[in-house]
Amino acid sequence: MNATTINSLFLIGALLVSASILVSSLSSRLGIPILVIILAVGMVAGVDGGGIIFDNYPTAYLVGNLALAVILLDGGLRTRVASFRVALWPALSLATVGVLITTGLTGMAAAWLFDLNIIQGLLIGAIVGSTDAAAVFSLLGGKGLNERVTASLEIESGSNDPMAVFLTVTLIDMLASGQTGLHWSLLTHLVREFGIGGVVGLGGGWLMLQMVNRINLATGLYPILVIAGGLFVFAVTNALHGSGFLAVYLCGLVIGNRPVRSRHGILHMLDGMAWLAQIGMFLVLGLLVTPHDLLPIALPALGLALWMILFARPLSVMVGLLPFKAFHGREKAFIAWVGLRGAVPIILAVFPLMAGLPHAQLYFNLAFFIVLVSLLVQGTSLPWVAKLLKVTVPPDPAPISRAALEVHVTSEWELFVYRLGAEKWCIGAALRELKMPEGTRIAALFRGQQLLHPSGSTVLEVGDLLCVIGHEHNLPALGKLFSQAPQRGLDLRFFGDFVLEGDAQLGAVSALYGLKLEGIDPDMPLSRFITQKVGGAPVVGDQVEWNNTIWTVAVMDGNKIGKVGVRFPEGSRPGPGLFL
């Protein structure tokens, strides 16, 4: 490879990445997922478009694994362990039982549609059986979904790859050796995949955390150390025949949920690296496919994709979530719809090609086609389906910017900046009248281009910028004070006519509003009553019906319900009482 060739590769790579980023700006306008646009750029530049011939499957496999490791590390860093209280076991059920059911149903349909034997059909089912972390993390961000739904989908996508990889490798071995039966040793292999991945991931994450917090380095080196450590955990786990994908996700989870030096620098760097990984991975996968090869299989492949989307995935979700009573029917329906397929099925489809199996090119083309249909149909309709099934909640008020304050090694102090809108009650109030959360301080106030020295007598005006020092757990309380309210009164319409304290006793509430207790302890707090009615760990947005009245969880205080919204039937709304 001479200098001219190397320079040409740099030029082509830079042009493709730049084109992907620039064209992705059309995503929100067209309502098409960014990943589809990046995939399309790769296809247009490929053999049937720009003429770039790329058929190096081992390189695609390498790029895909590297990119997924970075994406899962970033996803783990941003996943809060608190979300496990509502979604860990349901997500693991979907990641195991759900993948098995999807694989079986999709495999039987594939065998019938493409005249394959049952093992070959099941291999297709295994290849497309798991949801994709890159697609899920990318498309769910900022959609305002309730915590139970978001956490279930994210944890599922981060933990279901071991099952899909295990099934794919097992079925490839069976086809290569001519086996037709299953053995108990396969179950042992699966347990080993999960076990080694879990132990190495958690242990590696803890060691990385200690290393980052104890070693003094230049600030810019900490993100690189975390990325290198994550890839090391990924590689070691794979070498031990465990699940590297699960391990690197858990590694990020451990680091992201403990005080860590240069936290914001690490997150910002990983955000950019995760985007670069997604762009590079989907560009390579787009270049790898030959679009005209998809046309002969388009109709049966579309039928298989719709079968998986409309039947196999919904049935697997219904069975997988059957033991978990806290999930409403509409939440199950949404989780069933958002079975997003992305890079993982395409990467798994490279396995049969590298093994030299018959029909390997068919497996690859089918996987690519199903991913394309999934992203176009499910990804594009995600916001609309979320509203239709009512799984969205009003967004938490957030500062317009936030920055870390590295006061000490594991400092969690942050600087939050709020812009005061005209609708906030604090406009016209003096600073001394504000009920600031404990442990927070107003550090500065900007009015126009001028920096003011805030004092207790300073009166707040529309457009003021307030700089507040605090911790992440102070954000909900600070948001109520300073953030711009949701448009069109979304929070009032969503939570009901009044919002009651969770500590309010049922006896007082029922007496005030004329409700019937019917054997319920009048001293029971409203929060405990709603938790019992939900049937599991509650989240903001959970709704229950009692006394012909809708009760909605409005605020969570840790694991406990803090406030409850109440909506009365039309025409029977009583006067205000305990509401805030």
From Swiss-Prot:
Transmembrane portions of the chain: 6-26, 34-54, 57-77, 86-106, 108-128, 162-182, 193-213, 217-237, 240-260, 269-289, 292-312, 334-354, 366-386
Domain RCK C-terminal: from-to ranges: 402-484
Catalytic activity: K(+)(in) + H(+)(out) = K(+)(out) + H(+)(in)
Keyword Transit peptide: no
Pfam families to which the protein is assigned, alphabetical: CorC_HlyC, Na_H_Exchanger, TrkA_C
SUPFAM superfamilies per record: FAD-binding/transporter-associated domain-like (SSF56176), TrkA C-terminal domain-like (SSF116726)
BP-aspect Gene Ontology terms: cell volume homeostasis
GO molecular function, one term: flavin adenine dinucleotide binding
Record-level GO cellular component terms: plasma membrane
Entry keyword Protein transport: no
Cellular localisation: Cell inner membrane
Membrane topology annotation: Multi-pass membrane protein
This protein's UniProt keywords: Antiport, Cell inner membrane, Cell membrane, Ion transport, Membrane, Potassium, Potassium transport, Transmembrane, Transmembrane helix, Transport
PANTHER family linked to this entry: K(+)_H(+) ANTIPORTER NHAP2, NA(+)/H(+) ANTIPORTER 1
Entry similarity comment: Belongs to the monovalent cation:proton antiporter 1 (CPA1) transporter (TC 2.A.36) family. NhaP2 subfamily.
Physiological role: K(+)/H(+) antiporter that extrudes potassium in exchange for external protons and maintains the internal concentration of potassium under toxic levels.
Protein name: K(+)/H(+) antiporter NhaP2
Species of the source: Pseudomonas fluorescens (strain SBW25)
Gene it is expressed from: nhaP2
